[in-house]
Amino acid sequence: MKLKWKFNDLTGEKELERINRIVIDTEEKVEKALAFIDLEPSEAMFFNGYQTWTLSREYSRYDKMRGLNGMPEGVIRRYSLDGYGDYHIASYPYKPGVFHGFSYCYFRDGENYRFFGSLDEKPGYTIFGYNVKKNRLKIIRDAEGLVPDGSFHLLDLFYIEGTEEEVFDAWFEALGINAVPAPKIVGYSSWYNRFQDIDHGTIVQDLKGCKTILEPGDLFQVDDGWESAVGDWEPDPEKFPSGMKAMADEIHSAGFMAGLWISPFVAAKGSRVLKEHPEWVINDHKGETFSCGCNWRGFYGLDIDIPECLEYIENSVKKAVFDWGFDLLKMDFLYAGATFGNDKETRAGRMIRIMELVRQWVGDKRILACGVPLMPAFGLADYSRIGCDVGLSWRDRPFLRQIHRERVSTVNSIMDTIYRRQLDGRAFGNDPDVFFLRYENIELTEEEKDIVATVNALLGSVFLTSDDPGKYTEEQKERFRYYRHLTEAKNVKLIQHERIGFSYILDGREHEYLIPEDKVKE
């Protein structure tokens, strides 16, 4: 296959090889940096989404990739719906057979994969765009506006054909990336039951409940709601009057690993830090404030190029692990710290720098990355979310299905977990999000709860619930123990014929699990 490339006014071509590096000697500002490969479509095609929550599944040649198409501009602006994903980077024509993704993609026919992956994202995200009608794969280096210091990596591309195991093993070998040794963890997160409505009393209540079912060394994670404001990383004095060190000590006394949610690279409207330092906010290329989403009535990314801002972020992170004693930080909304690059650094380069910084700051404490472009987290995060948030229902309300690809959706979370499964143990430990067994405050059927728990147990390295186990019946406790045992399954293989499912080996015997067909249709 021929690979044709273009850098500004320069053009060239070469034979596609396993490793394709094109380096341009230049100090010229990047205006165009792309390549083309003529390529026949496959029966199934996968394009990795921009970040953790971006829907990432296999597509047929007849499918469409939905962005914010049809959403009124006023609604987009009011709720900053374009702040969560790649809507300021890529276009969404919403036509059959037109797809795009970041860092890697593949074309699958049966068991044979044609795989394309980036070997280095620091010079700019590698964006793969495909058009079935044109039979063309377009590869864009997301580096517009960058001024190189003498050379520019137009392309660092890996290509291979083979089975799933062969192509992903070969890619990570070529990358030279080894996942941080991260054992599977089981435990609890406060988010998907109490959400931000937590305080010392409710956390202690759930901690007591967890002692009835969790094992020593399991994770007990305090999620969003403990802080006085997002961006002001001190405990709310009314909710947690004894402070977060006391909370971590209580978790440790119960025999569990203590986890804490934090979003150190963002600040919400109304936070003290934004009132005192409005100049810390990241602006877009026009110099205008860019809202990264509508959580907490709106929030903004913080500029790590401002020394005082970076020091503030570093101190907030270190305080949580070294002063308060938390063993794991769930670092959320990481993408917001790198929504834009500049003439010296691409947005991907900035995202990688953020991940390198937090790895350095926390030392051997554990990082669970969330809301993060995935490849910058390879080999740096211990664990990473690889899908969107699950919901309390299966498909959510019809009007919510029209918003961004990063929306809360249980069925989308299942798809993400299935189709990003290959990253588990290679890039980091995959976190598929939580499962539920409870009967209250939930709309999922028993069948749907079983699907979530089974998929998470088989394909992930993080297996958390947000239930209060103190309310579990003996039957629910037995089911919890069953799913926990399922996390020990070996040789898990995807089945993709008339129905999606898995084969696996547990207790020396081969098993098969099939998901009902109507549950995984978009």
Describe the predicted segments one by one.
Residues 154, 221-222, 259-260, 330, ...:
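A structural signal for short, well-ordered beta-strand segments and their strand-loop junctions
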Residues 170-185, 367:
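Acidic/polar, glycine-enriched structural segments that form the non-catalytic walls/loops
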Residues 185-188, 192-318, 324-341:
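Aromatic-lined carbohydrate-binding/catalytic grooves of carbohydrate-active enzymes
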Residues 274-307, 311, 356-471:
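Glycan-recognition surfaces
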Residues 341-350, 381-382:
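Short glycine/threonine-rich loop-to-helix capping motif typified by GTGT followed
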Residues 203, 209-214, 236, 247-258, ...:
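Carbohydrate-binding surfaces of carbohydrate-active enzymes
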Residues 244, 347-355:
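Amphipathic alpha-helical segments in well-structured domains
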Residues 1-167:
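N-terminal accessory beta-strand-rich subdomains and adjacent acidic, glycine-rich linkers
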